[in-house]
Amino acid sequence: MVDLSQLYDNCVYSSIAHALFVLKEPFFSASQSWDGMNYSFNDFSGTRGTISFDLSGNILAGAVRSDESEQCNLYPEFKAIELFANAPENVKLLAQKEALEYLYDEADGVTQPIATAAFWSVGGEIVIDEDIEEFKANGGEYLFTIGVSHEELRDYWRGEYDLNNEELAAVDLIYERFKARGAIRSEDVPIIKSKEVQEPKKRGLFGRKQKTVEQEPDGYAECIASLGELGIVIE
């Protein structure tokens, strides 16, 4: 498992890969998102979660809910913050104020945060306070998907999102500029554009030129919005 710093970088890289993916598949725009320093994910199959980072304090708090987990049956009597019982107080506070705020749901008429697995960091090290297999069964599998080396993560998203060479190059460039706090110009990532591209050689009825839409307008908007959540602007 990587440390806090690498996990944060991996979440950023994953989100940039996601932004390029929704350029062509805008329906999945909600599968990854950022709100401040809170990274949220949703697999649309019953598992969702949020990782809240406090980089200045070198801590994070992560909470996940799997609808398939037996832990769900403990609610509403059980309180999600109890998953952080052995965490330091500053981590508990981060979990309560941030991560768990994204997991509100209703159980037997009671609306409260519902989580089935949790993890945190102490001194930058990621801590999982239960058996690894139980943690995965309770919704924690995604942490192991993104908690790998940069090269492994890059290969994972290339395959998962079926990114071609141009798309992957755009992901890498945006990520490198984000890390370096450098500007990104539209000509640096020509694949990200909303206008229709005409192909003169293709003709439809009555000899009219057919239009090929390179990127759907909503896909472009979702891509730009996803990047914007990280403060990334294409000039």
Go through the PLM ranges and name each one.
Residues 1-46, 55-56, 71-235:
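N-terminal domain-onset segments
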Residues 42, 62-63:
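Pocket-edge structural micro-motifs
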Residues 58-60:
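Primarily extracytoplasmic ectodomains and periplasmic/lumenal surface modules that are beta-strand-rich
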Residues 63-71:
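Short, solvent-exposed aromatic-acidic interface loops
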